[in-house]
Swiss-Prot record:
Organism, scientific name: Schizosaccharomyces pombe (strain 972 / ATCC 24843)
Gene Ontology MF: a single term: protein-macromolecule adaptor activity
Protein location: Cytoplasm, Cytoskeleton, Microtubule organizing center, Spindle pole body
UniProt entry tagged with the keyword Cytoplasm: yes
Origin superkingdom: Eukaryota
UniProt keyword terms in alphabetical order: Cytoplasm, Cytoskeleton
GO cellular component, one term: mitotic spindle pole body
Predominant localisation class: cytoplasm
Disulfide bond positions: none
Protein name in UniProt: Uncharacterized protein C323.03c
Length: 575
């Protein structure tokens, strides 16, 4: 055995022997050692062996596999030192302060392994005294060590990931190692930054740990983290842009991974806010910082191809808590609208591609939906739609801007986003002010032209959403009905020369019967039937059937009387 010990000590110093041989010999000697002094020699040399640690740093699963097998076999074999003595001896070695930072970190890594393995009942059955000794030693080392970004990331991978490399489970028990979260905040943040800078495309563990840690922090500590995140984004985005466009890297996945990691962090904070019933000033401040973070991430939104429920949840939750949601409508959109109206010409889409147009789109969209839901539930009065001066200015110019923008919709892949941004801004202009005729005669035909142009670019469901959203925002029944009446009359003559687009509009407008007040529903159905007479008999029959189907989907009591009325006027016209 003495010869085997000398041999393995030599192998650990030698660079020419294969790693597989070195690890196998080390494993064998550690398993069969009878003398604690020799055990200390081998472990100390193992800690000092740089090439083994370089390999383990790149292959965490191999690192865990080595120690899992060793401790599992040590528990059941009678060779060498007893199991308890074996663990206590190694822990005693690892407790001693190392001569330099690198060796100190390697000692911490080995303590992490023993901590994880002693937490697994299938490896060690309730070895509480041993685990307590390891936990105490590990806690002391973590408190005093200054972790680099790489070390922090590696530490998180060891402490929070499953011992089984094939499992995706994450255990947060390791947070109990330190009595206060301040040191954890430092380690987790450092590990998260390192994760964003590296090529880990699948393993998002540092992000998950940061999300969990945020839930343990106070609101003011969360704000501090968000401020750091904004600073990080501002510094990192130029290099991420360069990396995505540089032919040497051309790595969109790297940047995409970072974008979704940041959104995960914001989602975690939004969820914590969503669960709160008593919203304080600090909570409102946090929500404003979350919104601000999204604006700073504008470039990254190119990775969102369509509506995303996670992002919608974050935005809606924060908007429901901030004091003035409208102030987040971007200055970029405002300036672009004013320029296009003043020039009375072509809308410069390149100018609109600046920050933060796409984020503004999401905000206005979710804000509109939030107000709709509140109005439906009658939890707020009409004053909720009071806008800031900037938002009012956008709204007053929005219709003309939307018309110009939609007419250019085929000239840019992003134009669909801008169409939505302008239309959702228009949804708030002059709602419910004045008499129906005074209000609508000025703007209704611009609305109609915008909707007509949208029939060329949007699918049926999107058009339904826009129409219904516009009508649902009226609390004045008379104005809501007048709006739909003028729309139907405007589209009626178009049937003769723009059949396809008119048909799409009439199919979409069927959904309006569900959102109108009961007093206006029957009149709307009468107007609808009158306005579709320009279609062929076959097309009219299809539209009549679609109206019947829409009515059947409504609540039973209302649907029964409406369906009876609808059938009576259809039969009456046929006769």
């Amino acid at each position: 055995m003495e010869e085997a010990i000398n041999n393995v000590l030599l192998l650990l110093r030698e660079d020419s022997i294969s790693l597989e041989t070195v690890l196998w010999e080390t494993h064998y000697v550690l398993l069969n050692l009878h003398n604690e002094q020799n055990l200390r020699l081998v472990v100390a040399q193992l800690i000092a062996c740089g090439r083994i640690w370089d390999y383990w740093n790149e292959h965490r699963s191999e690192y865990f596999a080595f120690w899992v097998e060793l401790i599992s076999r040590k528990k059941v074999t009678n060779n060498g030192l007893p199991f308890s003595s074996f663990v206590k001896s190694i822990v005693g070695i690892l407790e001693v302060d190392a001569s330099n930072e690198i060796l100190c970190f390697r000692r911490i890594c080995l303590l992490c392994v023993f901590y994880k393995l002693l937490s697994c009942d299938h490896i060690v059955n309730l070895q509480y005294p041993l685990k307590r000794a390891v936990s105490k030693a590990l806690s002391k080392q973590i408190k005093t060590h200054q972790f680099s970004g790489f070390e922090a990331n590696f530490l998180l991978q060891q402490l929070f990931a499953s011992v089984d490399s094939s499992a995706s489970d994450i255990s947060f028990d390791a947070f109990s190692l330190l009595p206060h979260l301040l040191k954890w905040e430092e380690i987790v943040w450092s590990g998260f930054i390192n994760y964003l800078d590296t090529e880990h495309k699948r393993d998002s563990l540092p992000t998950a740990v940061l999300c969990h840690l945020l839930l343990r922090l106070s609101t003011y500590q969360q704000i501090s983290i968000i401020k750091r995140l904004i600073t990080l984004i501002d510094k990192a985005i130029p290099s991420w842009k360069s990396r995505s466009s540089d032919s040497k890297y051309n790595d969109h996945q790297f940047v995409k991974k970072n974008f979704f990691s940041i959104i995960m962090v914001l989602e975690s904070l939004a969820k914590s806010q969503y669960r709160k019933s008593n919203v304080l000033a600090a909570d409102r401040s946090l929500c404003e910082y979350i919104i601000l973070t999204l604006f700073h991430m504008e470039y990254l939104f190119s990775f969102v191809a369509s509506s995303w429920s996670t992002l919608d949840f974050v935005i809606t939750t924060c908007l429901s808590r901030v004091a003035q949601p409208a102030k987040f409508i971007s200055e970029t959109v405002r300036e672009a609208i004013i320029d296009s109206i003043q020039l009375e010409g072509y809308v410069d889409l390149q100018k609109l591609s600046g920050s933060p147009v796409l984020v503004t789109l999401s905000f206005i969209n979710n804000w509109q939906n939030l107000i709709c839901r509140r109005l439906e539930k009658q939890t707020v009065n009409e004053k909720v739609i009071t806008l800031s001066s900037t938002a009012k200015e956008i709204s007053s110019l929005g219709l003309s801007f939307a018309e110009k923008l939609i007419s250019q919709s085929d000239e840019s892949t992003l134009c669909k986003h801008y169409v939505y941004a302008s239309l959702y801004a228009c949804l708030f202009c002059n709602l419910n002010e004045g008499s129906p005729k005074d209000y609508l005669d000025n703007d209704i035909y611009v609305h109609a032209r915008c909707l007509f142009l949208l029939t060329k670019t949007l699918n049926l469901d999107s058009l339904k959403s826009i129409l219904c959203s516009r009508v649902r925002l009226y609390y004045n029944i008379e104005i809501a009905y007048y709006f739909t009446d003028v729309l139907l009359k405007w589209f009626q003559p178009i049937i003769r020369y723009e059949f396809d687009n008119a048909l799409i509009f009439y199919k979409a407008s069927i959904s309006l019967v569900s959102v109108l007040a009961p007093a206006a529903q029957k009149q709307f159905l009468s107007n609808y039937l009158n306005s579709i007479q320009g279609f062929s008999t076959e097309t009219k029959e299809d539209l009549i059937f679609l109206v019947s189907s829409q009515i059947r989907q409504m609540p039973y009591q209302n649907a029964t009387s409406l369906l009876s009325f609808w059938l009576s006027i259809v039969v009456g016209r046929a006769v």
